[in-house]
């Protein structure tokens, strides 16, 4: 699940994932903002609404008129980006990603 202190904002032509917790900026748990594009923004919104990976891929497929498989791959890559940047916490809800995301 996405950390509760994170939000996404649009600035300078990109979307930025940032922390809203001012205390994080003073300690070792600080993570730099993560830049993403419009597709990442829509995947973010789906994940914040607790969509499954499959539901997210279906949404992205319909939104951008791409194949489900391409949307699924994009979704997996975005979730991996989130995990690598410390944006995920708690138990991993998306069991279908267990083999993809270490």
Positions of the model-derived regions?
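Short alpha-helical segments that sit at the start of domains
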Residues: 13-41
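Hydrophobic packing positions characteristic
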Residues: 1-14
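Long, charge-rich, low-complexity alpha-helical segments
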Residues: 30-102
């Amino acid at each position: 699940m996405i950390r509760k202190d994170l939000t996404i904002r649009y600035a300078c032509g990109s979307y930025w994932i940032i922390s809203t917790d001012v205390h994080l900026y003073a300690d070792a748990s600080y993570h730099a903002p993560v830049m993403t594009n419009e597709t990442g923004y829509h995947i973010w919104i789906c994940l914040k609404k607790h969509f499954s990976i499959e539901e997210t891929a279906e949404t992205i497929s319909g939104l951008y008129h791409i194949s489900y498989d391409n949307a699924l791959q994009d979704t997996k890559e975005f979730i991996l980006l989130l995990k690598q940047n410390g944006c995920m916490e708690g138990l991993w809800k998306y069991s279908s990603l267990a083999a993809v995301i270490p």
